[in-house]
Amino acid sequence: MTSIRIGNGYDIHQLVEGRPLILGGVQIEHSLGLKGHSDADVLTHAIMDALLGALSLGDIGHYFPPTDPKWAGADSLKLLEQVHQLILDRGWQIGNIDSVVVAERPKLKPHIEAMRDRISQVLNLSPELIGIKATTNEKLGPVGQEQGICSYAVALLTSDS
């Protein structure tokens, strides 16, 4: 009998000057970047939290605390590799991931395919199992006022054991 688990994740980071904007492992040209201890890739962080949550393994702050200097400037795709290994070590496989990035600017649609490709390579999944959408917050709240970018993700895990 196949078992399934579903997890959801969320992340938000402030937009600031002097930092690159990295989403889904892709550097995107923009005048502002996301502030954070690592590369502040909100999409990848939300995906990691969804994967961890599906197995009740806590959140990324437990595994990669922002107070630990060894994670300063970390490439979030490298962290995603480690989270994926935790999932595999417990006998689970990723069924699919669906996500949305919320940002007023820049327009993200031209970058979605590259983000999907990067994430699918790290997770060794077919790109059609990775859903990434982009939307705005209709100028509402801190994301709508271009103070930050956030992301939501849902992950489905399966196990035959």
UniProtKB/Swiss-Prot annotation:
The record's Gene Ontology biological-process terms are: isopentenyl diphosphate biosynthetic process, methylerythritol 4-phosphate pathway; terpenoid biosynthetic process
Residues annotated for a divalent metal cation binding in this entry: 11, 13, 45
Q: Which reaction does it catalyse?
A: 4-CDP-2-C-methyl-D-erythritol 2-phosphate = 2-C-methyl-D-erythritol 2,4-cyclic diphosphate + CMP
**GO MF annotation, one:** 2-C-methyl-D-erythritol 2,4-cyclodiphosphate synthase activity
Tree of life domain: Bacteria
Site feature location: Transition state stabilizer? 37, 136
Q: Keywords for this entry?
A: Isoprene biosynthesis, Lyase, Metal-binding
Task: Give the record's cofactor note, including how many are bound.
Answer: Binds 1 divalent metal cation per subunit.
Q: In which pathway does it act?
A: Isoprenoid biosynthesis; isopentenyl diphosphate biosynthesis via DXP pathway; isopentenyl diphosphate from 1-deoxy-D-xylulose 5-phosphate: step 4/6
Main enzyme class: lyase
Q: Tell me its family.
A: Belongs to the IspF family.
Function according to Swiss-Prot or TrEMBL: Involved in the biosynthesis of isopentenyl diphosphate (IPP) and dimethylallyl diphosphate (DMAPP), two major building blocks of isoprenoid compounds. Catalyzes the conversion of 4-diphosphocytidyl-2-C-methyl-D-erythritol 2-phosphate (CDP-ME2P) to 2-C-methyl-D-erythritol 2,4-cyclodiphosphate (ME-CPP) with a corresponding release of cytidine 5-monophosphate (CMP).
* The protein, known as: 2-C-methyl-D-erythritol 2,4-cyclodiphosphate synthase
